[in-house]
């Protein structure tokens, strides 16, 4: 028997016609869920990009180091723009050549490398019904000459979403991860990540053995065991859905015991890293990538459908491509 189509009622928050909303919009604590957005691009210096964003969204620019700027009080809240390379940020590194020769050299290098080393625009927590407003920033960057991952053979630029977890319980976290691993081959077919990003391994899939463990409907660990299992299989940030920031937020001591030197920012969010950033493509919008994430959350919220999907995966004899077809039918038919 085929599963009934997913029927998610419209959100009372409204949202935007091109942008779907997840089925769970309020956390276990009763607050509206938010999402952070990060987009990488080249072709503009950090200072130039900050000016572009200020012109489009308002706010006041504050320089935090030669290649990092905050735009305070924009229509999207406080934003950050910086060159995505620690060596060009004297304030972030105690001992490097830039710190020795001064901020003027750091600023010059930031401008000189703007076509090679990407900039990154980062939002703070944004209400999920306002995600569509981020496209205004994308449009402004494109008009100013920003380049996307498709514009250079060595570019590997990503669009990242940091959706707030609906809660701190295993019931708020495991279903989302389970839905994600079961839909991963479908997502990759839809997203078609840039070959350079795949080659450089910025957003690798989860190991096959770990996928089978998480896919099993009988896998129901408590939170501590879940964190231990995750760390044993994934002692790295290099995953297309990075849970280390979330797990660090939930139990920092447990994570640091395994990864004492890993650079991990603690926050109550998933870190979805698979999509490309194609800022320069005419009409490129973050809507399709956001909607694919919402599709994962919708499957996660349907316990019966999720269990059927997991059981089917464990008994599936085919390859990844044919599983993507089967997963799409089971999840969305």
Residue ranges: model-predicted function:
Residues 1-2, 161:
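N-terminal cationic amphipathic segment used for targeting or macromolecule association
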Residues 106-111, 143-153:
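Catalytic micro-motifs at enzyme active sites that drive phosphoryl/nucleotidyl and oxygen chemistry
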Residues 153-160:
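Short, conserved phosphate-binding/catalytic loop or strand-edge motifs used
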